[in-house]
Swiss-Prot record:
The keyword Flavoprotein does not apply. Composed of six subunits; NqrA, NqrB, NqrC, NqrD, NqrE and NqrF. One of its GO terms (molecular function) is oxidoreductase activity, acting on NAD(P)H, quinone or similar compound as acceptor. Keywords: Cell inner membrane, Cell membrane, Ion transport, Membrane, NAD, Sodium, Sodium transport, Translocase, Transmembrane, Transmembrane helix, Transport, Ubiquinone. One of its GO terms (cellular component) is Gram-negative-bacterium-type cell wall. This is Na(+)-translocating NADH-quinone reductase subunit E. Its main location: membrane. The gene is nqrE. It comes from Neisseria gonorrhoeae (strain ATCC 700825 / FA 1090). The chain crosses the membrane at residues 11-31, 35-55, 76-96, 108-128, 139-159, 175-195. It catalyses: a ubiquinone + n Na(+)(in) + NADH + H(+) = a ubiquinol + n Na(+)(out) + NAD(+). GO terms for biological process: respiratory electron transport chain; sodium ion transport. It is found in: Cell inner membrane. It is a multi-pass membrane protein.
């Protein structure tokens, strides 16, 4: 149990996808203008990561040498299978949001299908394969990585909403000041890197 707790804390804070590895920055910067939209996208990313990392762990275990047929190693297919599983889960999420939460579906717009190619999603799945997590570890890691990404985007959206009323220099208004805020947040999250779990 302690191992899973340390893996969860590590994936949320120490190895934050957005602020430590800088993965998923396109949607991270583009959707971080309103807290409500950022929260909705964060929940969507938690859903996709929470399901795609363990699902891809199961698929990857079938691709390993001797898993299906003795002497056949299909691990060279891992990238295409990872992308296929992620795309299927995002399509399910998109259909669900369109049917049951149309306001969030419309607010996310083009960024919802872009979760399919969000490098934070693919990065978490690749880290799972590289670190050889078992199924339980992949569930904890997927949920923790998604929660960490959501924490980062909601915090940046809150800062961005407050900065609308600030007196920033004209050249830094908009994306410039957002980059500075994201950089300062990343530096703050670097303080977690010295923690050994």
């Amino acid at each position: 149990m302690e191992h899973y707790l340390s893996l969860f804390i590590k994936s949320v804070f120490i190895e934050n996808m957005a602020l430590s590895f800088f993965l998923g920055m396109c949607t991270f910067l583009a959707v971080s203008k309103k807290v409500s939209t950022a929260f909705g996208l964060g929940v969507a990313v938690i859903f996709v990561l929470g399901l795609s990392v363990p699902a891809n762990q199961l698929v990857y275990s079938l691709l390993k040498d001797g898993a299906i047929v003795e002497g056949v190693d299909l691990t060279f297919l891992k990238f295409i299978t990872f992308i296929g599983v992620i795309a299927a889960l995002v399509q399910i999420l998109e259909m669900f949001l369109d049917k049951f939460v149309p306001a969030l579906y419309n607010a996310l717009g083009i960024y919802l299908p872009l979760i399919t190619v969000n490098c934070a999603i693919f990065g978490a799945v690749s880290f799972m394969a590289q670190r050889e997590y078992d199924f339980g570890e992949s569930v904890v890691y997927g949920f923790g990585a998604g929660l960490g990404w959501m924490l980062a985007i909601v915090a940046l959206a809150g800062i961005t909403e407050k900065m609308k009323y600030s007196d920033a220099p004209k050249g830094l208004k908009g994306l410039g000041i957002t980059f500075i805020a994201a950089g300062l947040m990343a530096m703050a999250f670097m303080s977690f890197s010295g923690i050994q779990l």
